C-alpha cells in the first residue's frame, strides 16, 4: 500500500515516465513469416554499406537481372525515423495488443504491421517491373550493427548483402561530396579548405596541405571501422548463409563474376548476355554527372568511382591518423599487408 502511495505521489509530481515509452517490439516469428508470405510472396534482400562505398552502383547492377528489382533509400532500418516508428508509441502498443481486440489472438501485432508495410512498398514497385525478387539499397552509416539486428527482427528470412570499400577512398569520397554540396555542416576551417581548393588545387596534391581537418578524419574513419566491424559480425551471426559481403574494388575489377555470385545467392542464374549489360552500366556514372552540375570546379578535381584516389591526396598526417584508427581493419579486408604504406 505504501509503495502505491509513493508511485502515485511520483506521478503527480514528475509525471508517468513509463507512459512515454512502449515495451520492446517483439521479433516476428517463423509462423508469422510463413503466413505473411501467403500475401507477399516475393523473396526479399537488402543492400547495406557505409556511405560512399558503392551501394548505388551495386543497386544499379543487381537490378539488371530480368528477375530482380532493387530500389533505394527506403531506410527501413538504417536511418531515423525508422520503420519501427510506425508502432513505437505507447498508444500503438496499447491498440495492437489490446485484449478486447479479437483480431490479434492475444498477441502484439507490431511485427506484422512493420513487415506488411515494408513488403507492400517493395512488392508494389516490383510488380510494376514484373519481377519476382525485390530488395532495397540503403546506406547504413549511422546505425551500424543495430540496423542488422532491426532488419533481422522483421526479415529473418531475407538476404543481406554488404559492400565494403577501402576506408581511405570512403573518406576521400565523403569529403568531396560535402565540399561539392557546400554542406551546411561545414565549419569555418572546412570553408577555408574549400576556398583554397578553388584557388589552387595543386597545393592539395603535393603533400603540403590536407583537404581534411583532424576532426573530419576521426569522425569518418571511426564510423567506417565501426560500420564494417559491426555489420560483418552481426550479419554472419544472425543471417548465416543468407549474409554475404563483397569489396567494391572487386566489383570494379571483375564485375560479371561478382554479380554472378550475388545473383546465385538470390537464387537466379545469370545469362551470359548480362555481361554486356553490366559493361554498359559501368560506362556511366550518374553521381559524377550530378556533382559536375552542382559544383563543377570542385567536382572536376577528383575522378569519381575509382579506387586509389586517396594516394593523390593523403598527407603524412592523414596517413598516420588513418593507420592509428583503421590500419588493422585495412589489413583484415586485404587492402594492405602491413602498416608501412
Short names for language-model regions:
Residues 83-85, 128-133, 138-273, 285-296:
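PAPS-dependent sulfotransferase catalytic domain
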Residues 52-53, 64-65, 75-77, 140-142, ...:
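Short, solvent-exposed loop/turn segments at secondary-structure junctions
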Residues 80, 277-285:
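Post-kinase regulatory C-tail/linker adjacent to protein kinase catalytic domains
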Residues 38, 101, 203-215, 302-306:
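Short glycine/proline-rich turn/loop motifs
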Residues 1-119, 128, 180-181, 187-194, ...:
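PAPS-dependent sulfotransferase catalytic core
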Residues 303-341:
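C-terminal accessory extensions appended to soluble enzyme cores
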Residues 268-278, 338-339:
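Short, surface-exposed acidic
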Amino acid at each position: 500500500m505504501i509503495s502505491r502511495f509513493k508511485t502515485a505521489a511520483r506521478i503527480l509530481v514528475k509525471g508517468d515516465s513509463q507512459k512515454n515509452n512502449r515495451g520492446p517490439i517483439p521479433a516476428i516469428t517463423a509462423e508469422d513469416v510463413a503466413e505473411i508470405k501467403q500475401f507477399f510472396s516475393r523473396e526479399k534482400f537488402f543492400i547495406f554499406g557505409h556511405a560512399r562505398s558503392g551501394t548505388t552502383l551495386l543497386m544499379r547492377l543487381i537490378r539488371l537481372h530480368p528477375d530482380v528489382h532493387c530500389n533505394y533509400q527506403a531506410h527501413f532500418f538504417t536511418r531515423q525515423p525508422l520503420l519501427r516508428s510506425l508502432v513505437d508509441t505507447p498508444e500503438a502498443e496499447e491498440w495492437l495488443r489490446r485484449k478486447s481486440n479479437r483480431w490479434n489472438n492475444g498477441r502484439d501485432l507490431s511485427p506484422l504491421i512493420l513487415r506488411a508495410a515494408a513488403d507492400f512498398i517493395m512488392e508494389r514497385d516490383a510488380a510494376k517491373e514484373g519481377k519476382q525478387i525485390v530488395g532495397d539499397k540503403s546506406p547504413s552509416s549511422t546505425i551500424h550493427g543495430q540496423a542488422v539486428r532491426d532488419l533481422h527482427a522483421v526479415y529473418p528470412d531475407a538476404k543481406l548483402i554488404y559492400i565494403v570499400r577501402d576506408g581511405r577512398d570512403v573518406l576521400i569520397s565523403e569529403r568531396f561530396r560535402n565540399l561539392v554540396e557546400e554542406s551546411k555542416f561545414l565549419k569555418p576551417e572546412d570553408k577555408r579548405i574549400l576556398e583554397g581548393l578553388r584557388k589552387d588545387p595543386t597545393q592539395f596534391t603535393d603533400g603540403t596541405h590536407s583537404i581534411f581537418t583532424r576532426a573530419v578524419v576521426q569522425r569518418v574513419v571511426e564510423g567506417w571501422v565501426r560500420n564494417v566491424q559491426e555489420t560483418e559480425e552481426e550479419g554472419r551471426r544472425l543471417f548465416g548463409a543468407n549474409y554475404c559481403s563483397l569489396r567494391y574494388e572487386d566489383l570494379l575489377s571483375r564485375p560479371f563474376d561478382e554479380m554472378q555470385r550475388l545473383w546465385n545467392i538470390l537464387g537466379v542464374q545469370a545469362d551470359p548476355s548480362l555481361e554486356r549489360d553490366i559493361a554498359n552500366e559501368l560506362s556511366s556514372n550518374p553521381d559524377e554527372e550530378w556533382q559536375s552540375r552542382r559544383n563543377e570546379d570542385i567536382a572536376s578535381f577528383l575522378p569519381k568511382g575509382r579506387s586509389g584516389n586517396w594516394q593523390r591526396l593523403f598527407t603524412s598526417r592523414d596517413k598516420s591518423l588513418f593507420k592509428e584508427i583503421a590500419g588493422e581493419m585495412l589489413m583484415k579486408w586485404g587492402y594492405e599487408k602491413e602498416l608501412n604504406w
